[in-house]
Each structure stands twice: as structure tokens, then as C-alpha cells.
Amino acid sequence: MAYYRTPHDVTALPAWQALQQHRDAMQGFSMREAFAADAQRFDQFSLSCCGLFLDYSKNLITEQSRDLLVNLANEVGLQDAIKSMFAGEIINASEGRPVLHTALRRPVGDKLSVNGVNVMPEVHKVLNQITELVGRIHDGLWRGYSEKPITDVVNIGIGGSFLGPELVSEALLPYAQRGVRCHYLANIDGSEFHELSANLRAETTLFIVSSKSFNTLETLKNAMAARTWYLAQGGSEAELYRHFIAVSSNKAAAVAFGIREENIFPMWDWVGGRYSLWSAIGLPIALAIGTANFKELLSGAYTMDQHFQTAPFDKNMPVLLALLGVWYGNFWGANSHAILPYDHYLRNITKHLQQLDMESNGKSVLQDGTPVKTDTGPVIWGGVGCNGQHAYHQLLHQGTQLIPADFIVPVVSFNPVADHHQWLYANCLSQSQALMLGKTREEAEAELRGKGLNEADIEKLAPHKVIPGNRPSNTLVVERISPRRLGALVAMYEHKVFVQSVIWGINAFDQWGVELGKELGKGVYQRLVGSLEESAEDGSTQGLINYFRGRHRG
């Protein structure tokens, strides 16, 4: 029987019990001492794959820890779960769907059946459609209503229709194609549209409306605003098709909006939004970096898919990262995880991983709807490089919470300035080192004596200078950011999230919590504009509605 049909109490498994006992035995474990005692620790706890290098030696683990965590993966049936996903079985139980974002990066010639139909020809048909459109725009053949070539593309979408594409197009900016600029419009805040449209010309702007249902509130409101702006700037209804295309499974709604059927790129219900950048949702990526580089992105993700399916768990990068997350979240009390990219172009990766992880594993019931017996997904947060060192790293070093971190850094910069990159790389390594080593009371006192302080002042100041250390982190190194390596990196985190969902017995591919806010939002809106006089369900919400209505102008 498939794993998703047999929800388990993971805390009752022998491997979980063994890990609990091991955690108790690890209470006094010191990474500083472990490195001093074992010159091979770095080699034992690091690996390379798909253009990525992972150092996970700065973790609160021994070889026994790793073995016990791998035992847990085996006991929950992880290998069967992986096979089920890649085979197209219905692992999204609450929605009755397979999960096949991995199909989008499989090569020509592969076969994969969904309900008895090989979906791969359709996948590659859409990829060819993307290639054709991108070629026409880059070659100046797609023209606006004034017959001028398109110079700006605006992707209108939110959530997975925005975060993944924005991450990739920004991360691969050094690969950007000249002549076409890509922009993103997500928030329903009118200020975002105002600031964006101020720098655009309607006659040379193409809008991509990305919404699977073509019914997403924020996306439709922004699409209507873009349409109104386009008409006010001199465009006509008759020429609308030159300036609006869609990525949607609702062709009828897109056609009713004014988009020609041949300019509607399909989506499939077996691709979730936060896993959709590999699909036609990635059209703005292809427009930004070209289809050759987009295909390299897909190829890099495919290499990670192969690694994930074939590597033994103790040498499997996504599996190891997932197991470490379980180790800290369920046995060490960690409630959050920091993502710290030391690269300007990767500055948006934290936002994408927030959605990927928190929307996937922010669940409190098992696949069968019964309550979980343990904590599930952590809060994902962080930010770019050295900026964080002068903001929130203080809490990582001396705060009371254990917060594991992933440092992500390239060896080579696209834009070397003097010795800046050497300093950037040095800062990345020194932060992970400082988290691990810390500073003892004796070291703090010796440092203060070296500065000439008297013993009374040393006694007062030393406690403030002590840094506990023993704080875990992973360091992910790439030689240089490229489409292929970025594809592997993003796919790695996708698989990490899936592995954790299997261990906890939850569904990583639905998001019912998001829907409640949408439903309630309709009633709040009606009360704000006066079309519904009935009071809100609670006094707080009604009070805030009254506050708005008493002061809003416009």
C-alpha cells in the first residue's frame, strides 16, 4: 500500500525512540571538541553533487547521529515515497492529485503516464511554444500596437507565479538577454503598479497574466489595472492581443479578457504553484535569460532529481539536509531556520524558500486528517550576506534560541571589485565558524587582559563577551552561479521539503490554510465598501472595518 495511505505516528517508530535516546546522550556534545579530536570530520560530513558542494560538518552530529537519522528515513518508507512521486502516483491525497513538477525537467524521449496518458509530449510541446515566443520577442518580431518591438515584459502573478520566477531571473541577471527587460507585479497595493508603470511605455510593453485559475484576486485586479493603463496610454481593444498573454488552465476566462487562444500557455493540476517555475510560469525567466539558459536550468534540476532518486541516503544531499532539519526541529527544539545567501544575485532565494517550505510543511494534520504528534515545518527567514551580520546575526550568536542556518556562497563573482569577493567569502566562512566555535569565558577574559583592563572591569565585562558557540550550520558552495547549478540548488530544496513531509506524515502539496483568508476577505471587502451591513464575525475585525470607513478617502 502506498505510503500516503498509511499515516504513521512517527514518534512511535523504533528509529525515533533511538534518536531520542541519542539526543539525551548528545547533551554535552561540543563541535569544537569534535573538530579537535577528528582531523577527518570535514571529509566525513561533506559531499559534492550537481555542481554543489555541501559542508555539513558544523552540525551537532556524529556518525552515529547520521546513521540513526538514515534509519528513520528507512522506517518511514522514504524510498517508496520517492518512487511514488516520480511515478505519478496520487501523493497529494487531499486534492486527489499526483505531484509531477519533476516531469517538467525530464528530457525528450522520457515517458510518464498520468491516468494512462503519457504527459511528456505535452510538456515538451509547451516548452517548444515557449521557445518560439521567446525567439519572436528577442528577434523583434513580436510588435506592439505601434509596430515597435517589445522592450519590457511585466509578469503579473503572485505566490508561486512570482517568487520562483523572480528568484531565477534575478539570480541569473548576468545571463540576461539584451533588449528586453523583465518586471514583476504581484501585490494588490496600487503603489506597486504606480511605480512600475511610471517607467513603462504601453506601446512596447507585454504583460504576462499568470494564474492557473485566471481567478486569483490580486492577479486579476492587477491585470485589469494594466489593461486600463494600456488603453489610457493609447492602446486599443483591437490590438490588446499584442500586449497580453496568459499562463492559465482556464482558457475561457483568458479569452474573455481579450487574450488570443494561441497566446495562452497551459498549466496542469499536477504542478503546484510553488513548484511551477519549471513550467510555462517560467516564461518570464526564459524571456530574461533566453531559452537555451532556461533549458540549462531544467537540466540542472533534472540532475538533482537523478541524484535524489539514486544516491544512498547517507550521501544524498536533499535527504541529509531534510534529516538535519528534523533533528533540530524535533529533538533540539529549533523553531526556525535561517537562509543566508552571500551573493547579491541570490538575494531573493530566502523569499522563494519561505513559500516552498512554509506553505508545504506548515501543516498540523496527517494525510488522513488526524492530528500530528510532533512539530512540523519551521519558520524560514534570513537575508543576504554581510547585511545580516549587521542586523540579526547577533541573535544567532548570543540569543537564547537554537537557529540552524544555511550559508550559500559562490567561489567566483561575476563582478570582481578589488578584493571585495575575497572579503565576502571570508565573512561567510567566519560567520559559520563563529557560530560553531563561540568564545569561552577564559578566552573573553584573556582578550580583555590583553587590552589592559583591570580585573574588576574584566569581571563585569567578560560575561557579555562570552559567545556560547555550538550553533549548527550548513555551508553550500557553488563555483559560480549558473543556470544549471541554480536549477540543482532549487530542486535540492524542493526535495528536502518533500522528505520532511514524508517523515512527519503530512501533505506537502496542498495549502488549505491560504484559502480561509481568501474566503473571509470577500466579506471584509463587502463591509468596507458598504455592500454588506451585517457585522463581522468578531469585534476586532468589525472595529477595524469601522476605523477604515470613518477615515478612508478615495
Curated annotation (Swiss-Prot):
Keyword Cytoplasm: yes
Residue ranges of coiled coil: none
Reaction(s) catalysed by this chain's protein: alpha-D-glucose 6-phosphate = beta-D-fructose 6-phosphate
Active site annotation, chain numbering: E359, H390, K518
CC annotations in GO: cytosol
NCBIfam families assigned: PRK00179.1
Family (UniProt): Belongs to the GPI family.
Name of the molecule in the record: Glucose-6-phosphate isomerase
Lineage: Bacteria, Pseudomonadati, Pseudomonadota, Gammaproteobacteria, Pseudomonadales
Gene, per the UniProt record: pgi
